Amino acid sequence: RITMGFLFTSESVSEGHPDKVSDQISDAILDEFLRHDPNSKVACETLCTTGLVVVAGEVRSEAYVDVQGVARRVINQIGYTKGDYRFDGNSCGVVSAIHEQSPDINQGVVREAEEEQGAGDQGIMFGYACNETREFMPATLILSHVILKELAVIRREGKVMTYLRPDSKSQVTIEYDEQTNRPLRVHTIVVSTQHDEFILPGNGLTEKEAEQQMQERIREDVRTILIPRVKARLERAGDKLADLITGDYILHVNPTGKFVIGGPHGDTGLTGRKIIVDTYGGRGAHGGGAFSGKDSSKVDRSAAYAARHIAKNLVAAGVADEVLVELSYAIGIAQPLSIYVDTYRSPRPAALAGMTDGEIARRIGKLFDLRPAAIVKRFGLKNPIFEATASYGHFGNRPYRKSVKVWEHGVETEREVEFFGWEKLDAVDDIRREFEL
């Protein structure tokens, strides 16, 4: 009999999506505080709407940050540089309502001995990994991200599809094999992108006809320019995901028709509203806490990064094909209250034949120091590395080192720091030893 596959879908949004504009401003402000004072405590929320950015939050820091300047730089960098967009970096208003962190919170978090620093809040955090892509991420999400990354490259090059504006979304549905849970092929791709009004009514063209011609042109360009470039990009990187995009997928482009009004003028953006795009595209689980604008004393962020690091290293070490890790914390307490592991009954090596998920979790607790200060140290989370995480996902990126400007003792200097350190596979050997693999 023919086995039917099942369908799973993930979405992504571009750096020009209003919620992502907010995330990037929040993280850029966090980075600016950390550049001047690595011990800054920051919780920064941003709202973007027509012609206006509002930044609010709690900060405890020795540093002064030019909030207006940072927000404008981010907005211009994303590409909101024209008055037509009704939101641009040079003319929008920027209101800052940042005030000091509550001493009640501070006393529970800051300790004499740094390694005993308590968690900044209670909460649950999840980390997930699977072996269906070389990033140890769901294929649906990786493809959704890559489509929009390539669209942004095309927009910035300005050679083809010159009508592109910064706001866009993608969605990818993949058919999986019911027996093996492996991805078989891309079933549906949705691309919605903001664009200039590049065909105007007049000269015998009605408004409806002009709109239809624009839509046909954009659809054709996505089919013949964007998707082939996405495939080529994956092939250049030696990525097998390219093989999933065959000729018979369904393509929807700007299904409502015209998409000229967009960005923060079309929809108000808020920090922390794209938490599934930021993580695993609907796979695994999510504790509900957003990442952007929070310094690493907030376990919402640092412990979610640590949980991803554990899950990814467990899968890479061959413990299971798919792993979910949950950590929980209480405010002011350093050690996690619980560690939970779910291997989804996925195949595991003979050496682990009788081992329960509970036993795996107990061993993880022994292998990894999950106190907030230890996590911060392991991944260098006091460095200004967060703006890079605020678009196209916090996970599934390659770790890299780069020189950044920081201030030490009132003097600006360059320091090499690591980005996406939680994606390193540096615990695989320890895990294999522990589990005798």
Give the residues covered by each predicted segment.
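Conserved phosphate/anionic-ligand binding catalytic regions in large, soluble enzymes, centered on
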Residues: 11-13, 17-22, 117-134, 259-285, ...
